Amino acid sequence: MSTGGPQKLEAQGGKEGKEWDDGAEHDGVTKIYVAAGGLGIEQIRFDYVKNGQPKEGSFHGVKGRSTISTIEISHPAEYLISMEGWYDSTNIIQGIQFKSNKHTSQYFGYEFFGDGTQFSLQVNDNKIIGFHGFADSHLNSVGAYFAPISSSLTTTPNKVEAQGGNGGETFDDGVFDHVRKVYVGQGESGVAYVKFEYEKDGKRETRDHGKMTLLGTEEFEVDSDDYITSIEVSVDKVFGYNSEIVTALVFKTSKGTTSPPFGMVTEKKFELKDGNGGKLAGFHGKASDVLYALGAYFAPSTTSTTPSTTKKLQARGGNGGASWDDGVFDGVRKILVGQGNDGVAFVTFEYNKGSQAILGDGHGKKTLLGTETFELDYPSEYITSVEGYYDKIFGVEAEVVTSLTFKTNKRTSQPFGMTAGEHFELKEDGYKVVGFHGKAGDLVHQIGVHIVPIFTNYRVAI
């Protein structure tokens, strides 16, 4: 095996049609276009980056009445590591799936059902930089060029210096994929407490610093398709403290959302921001009984793994409890619903991300009635809509969700709860549910969904 240049893996599938070769003189793959029809993959195209400049590829195959689906790869932080698929006796590629170092694509075409030949294009510690194969009216075969993953592609987060005083103990939360929620607690003189909810590899983690007071906390939640771009830090010298302390925080996001000022804004302000337009990925600073200083880590905004096709449907129900958002995944595997005396008291969802099953946080409060489970036959089964009811119940100020029913591409679940009150349906034709959000306290007050287009076609035996 040669290590002096790109490595070429032979095309998998049939050799019918015209041979095509995009070449290997690329830095990476930036976009993939796939059209899947009744007989398999009809057409495919790859866009690349070469010497830092975008390069459009050519279409291979002929698109019929099918629609073209796209995958965007955020070069250079994200790169393609494998392509998997299968072909049958027609020597046409029937289904394909792509994996990057950040996420796994939808399955395009038919899922493998046991009658055909599976293949995988992958080289350890290498990335895909080009494709080749054969195509006629459909994609007959596909192979790939690989090159070592350059260390220069590993983006080092930018650590922005902490602003404020020198008191307290140093903390450093490190770097995460996302900052999902920020909690700020006030004291008599400034910010006394902060808690940050992070996400890494699909799992939520929290870090807190300082000391919470009887004033409690205020929160700022970031939408799953948004990210924080800057933090304004107000500092001041306050009687009783040997150094300056943080008196207020203001957060701004890429979509133009600005939080209210959490605390007392002063004339002396600093802005924590990345000069390259990066997104917030973690915090560091100094704290004890108050927050003395705050700094931040920023990562390239291209590390966002949320597909641009994701939509967030507004949560339905009453305006009670605290907001929660599980984020966006590849799909839903399992749903657990717990009943209370008058409504839905608890929900939790098991998702799929890449090759991992991820159990989300519980929302609400379990009762002695326990939980009921609705399990999906993932990945061939997916949720297409969520129906429910919400109503005002005695002793609770805000309406609560009283019933939930889940519809998939194969069946409808039983109603979990009592079908009474205001009816709602969370649905958009051609989309499937890949995440949930809402509001909950001791009961579930609201529920909403994240959805993505349904790209997968499934072969039906007749």
Swiss-Prot record:
Pfam families: Jacalin. Residues 6-148, 157-300, 310-453 form the Jacalin-type lectin domain. Expressed exclusively in flowers, in male and female organs, petals and pedicels. Not detected in pollen grains or sepals. One of its GO terms (molecular function) is carbohydrate binding. Residues 1-23 are annotated as: Disordered. Induction: Up-regulated by methyl jasmonate. Residues 13-23 have a biased composition (Basic and acidic residues). CDD domains: Jacalin (cd09612). Keywords: Lectin, Repeat. PANTHER family: JACALIN-RELATED LECTIN 12-RELATED (PTHR47293:SF11), JACALIN-RELATED LECTIN 3 (PTHR47293). Belongs to the jacalin lectin family. This is Myrosinase-binding protein 1. It comes from Arabidopsis thaliana (Mouse-ear cress).
